[in-house]
Regions:
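Extreme N-terminal starter segment of soluble prokaryotic enzymes
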Residues: 1-6
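Short, well-ordered beta-to-alpha junction loops that form the rim of enzyme active sites
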Residues: 10, 98-101, 141
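Short N-terminal binding/cap micro-motifs at the start of the first secondary-structure element
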Residues: 13-19
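Short, surface-exposed acidic-centric catalytic microdomains
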Residues: 23-65
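Divalent-metal-activated hydrolytic enzyme cores
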Residues: 47, 56-86, 117-142
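Internal, conserved structured core segments that host functional sites
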Residues: 98-113
Length: 142
């Protein structure tokens, strides 16, 4: 029986990015992942009630704010809770998440200035999963 992993839906080609697009990682990476894992797609931002497309958001201090200055911390937290629920429901030991995202970034995220600058940190979902013992990697580590 294969292990199970949640994966950012945008990495599988689902159009759920903030701009309505996706971050498809390509057939070779997906094939490699499917050799070892049953993949469960998740989009924490959609699960949190945010629309697609949506105004970009970044982590600023202890909050997540949109480029328009709207506090969307609650929505990001709700989406993270949903992703954790699914990871536990399917007994996932790994999560493959979108690099640099305010939800899914693992190690680096955008710094909250909307200038494209990266800083050390974890997205809301990546942090919650890690705190609950689920290993998080990004698409660059496949």
């Amino acid at each position: 029986m294969k292990k199970k992993a949640i994966i950012s839906a945008c990495l599988l080609g689902l159009d759920c990015r903030y701009d309505g697009g996706n971050n498809y990682v390509g057939d070779e990476k997906i094939k490699k992942l499917k050799e070892n894992y049953e993949l469960i797609p998740v989009c924490p931002e959609a699960y949190g009630g945010l629309t697609t497309p949506r105004v970009p958001s970044e982590i600023a201090g202890d909050k997540v704010v949109s480029r328009l200055g709207v506090d969307v911390t609650h929505e990001f937290g709700k989406g993270a809770d949903a992703a954790l629920y699914l990871a536990k429901l399917f007994d996932c030991d790994c999560a493959i998440l979108k690099a640099n995202s305010p939800s899914c970034g693992s190690g680096t995220v955008y710094d909250g200035t909307f200038s494209g600058t990266l800083t050390e940190g974890y997205g809301v979902t990546a942090r919650l999963l890690t705190e609950n013992g689920i290993r998080v990697i990004d698409e660059n580590e496949i």
